[in-house]
UniProtKB/Swiss-Prot annotation:
This is Biotin synthase. It comes from the Bacteria. The keyword Iron applies. PANTHER family: BIOTIN SYNTHASE, BIOTIN SYNTHASE, MITOCHONDRIAL. Residues 39-264 form the Radical SAM core domain.
Length: 331
């Protein structure tokens, strides 16, 4: 039997991406329905526990200290503040809480200790917790696991070739090494990328191929659409079409049949009808709440109304145990 990496060559993924749109959506929807309960949507709430002041030069990011944007460095949030926001989000229907910090890497200090306490507190509320904190060591990953962390987010962003044009302060190999550490710790991997940065279709295909070559499939694959922010190098980047977004979502669903495919940043650009097409084509996770780190997101009440309109229900927390790898299947 072919392994997942053998099955999904660059050529095979590109062929899927370029499939006629009706056939592509039909295939992706069939795979979604065969692997997940019908009409179930994961709702994630994102909290920026440390905003701004990042030393990296990611061309898309408002939190870089190298650019003059609307974002100013803020002190790290207090534990009680984060727990209060998490509690409100869970009451509103969120089943995963994601904690983000504008760090290049995790440091063994009081801020990391505070993050561990946040994880413990939110886990005790019955929600999954995901963190995106930058690069980390094996011992730090172990501490996160012991604190109850469910998943760790570390995106590849794009293909290795295109990556070099948007980030110079961190190598692609550094990101792959971080994913290795997360996988070995027993934590679930949340890893995807950003589209609409000026990359080609080949770059998007290579991003998915790099993920498909991993020993374990990611638990979540977030698909972010660039939100151009004034002051960043990509502010004047032309928008991509909705059909490119839809093709990326559907291709990700086909390549990663048992992973959550998250319609992440940029969703606020899409109408309810466009979002519905993305759900039909394989997206089964969204960020729930008015803010995604530094950019706007859909209003929570509007999202609740959309879910009710579509007859969708919230995916329960801990539908997959920690340490349980996502098994690839041939589709």
């Amino acid at each position: 039997m072919e392994t997942h990496s053998e099955l999904w060559s660059l050529e095979a993924i590109k062929e899927v991406y370029n499939t006629p749109i009706f056939e592509l959506i039909h295939r992706a929807n069939a795979i979604l329905r065969s692997n997940f309960p019908h009409s179930e949507l994961q709702t994630c709430y994102l909290v920026s526990i440390k905003t701004g002041g990042c030393t990296e030069d990611c061309a898309y990011c408002a939190q870089s200290s190298r650019y003059q944007t609307h974002v100013k460095p803020e002190p790290m949030m207090k534990i009680t503040e984060v727990l209060d926001r998490a509690k409100q989000a869970i009451r509103a229907g969120a089943t995963r809480v994601c904690l983000g910090a504008a760090w290049r890497e995790v440091k063994d200090n009081h801020q990391f200790d505070r993050t561990l306490e946040m994880i413990k507190g939110i886990t005790d509320m019955g929600a999954e917790v995901c963190c995106t904190l930058g690069m980390l060591t094996p011992s730090q990953a172990e501490k996160l696991f012991e604190a109850g962390l469910y998943a760790y987010n570390h995106n590849l962003d794009s293909s290795e070739g295109f990556y070099k044009t948007i980030i110079t302060t961190r190598k692609y190999e550094d990101r792959l090494r971080t994913l290795d550490i997360v996988e070995k710790s027993g934590l679930h991997v949340c890893c995807g990328g950003i589209i609409g940065m000026g990359e080609t279709v080949e770059d998007r295909v290579e991003l998915l191929h790099n993920l498909a070559r991993r020993e374990r499939m990611p638990e979540s694959v977030p698909v972010n659409v660039l939100w151009p922010i004034k002051g960043t190098p990509l502010y004047d980047q032309a928008s991509i079409s909705f059909w490119e977004i839809l093709r990326t979502i559907a291709t990700a669903r086909i390549v990663f049949p048992q992973s959550m495919v998250r319609l992440a940043a940029g969703r606020a650009f899409l109408s309810v009808e466009q979002q519905t097409l993305c759900f039909i084509a394989g997206a089964n996770s969204i960020f729930y709440g008015e803010k995604l780190l530094t950019v706007d997101n859909n209003d929570m009440d509007a999202d609740t109304a959309m879910l009710n309109l579509l007859g969708m229900r919230h995916r329960p927390s801990f539908s997959m145990e920690r340490g349980q790898p996502c098994q690839s299947v041939t589709c």
